From Swiss-Prot:
Annotated S-S bridges: 1-8
Annotated protein name in UniProt: Resact
Residues carrying Leucine amide: 14
Organism, scientific name: Arbacia punctulata
Highest rank taxon of the organism: Eukaryota
Function (record text): Causes stimulation of sperm respiration and motility through intracellular alkalinization, transient elevations of cAMP, cGMP and calcium levels in sperm cells, and transient activation and subsequent inactivation of the membrane form of guanylate cyclase.
Keywords per UniProt: Amidation, Disulfide bond
Length: 14
C-alpha cells in the first residue's frame, strides 16, 4: 500500500 492510502497506516510496502 502507499502512504495516505485508505486502510494503510504508516505507509507500508504492499
Amino acid at each position: 500500500c502507499v502512504t495516505g492510502a485508505p486502510g494503510c497506516v504508516g505507509g507500508g510496502r504492499l
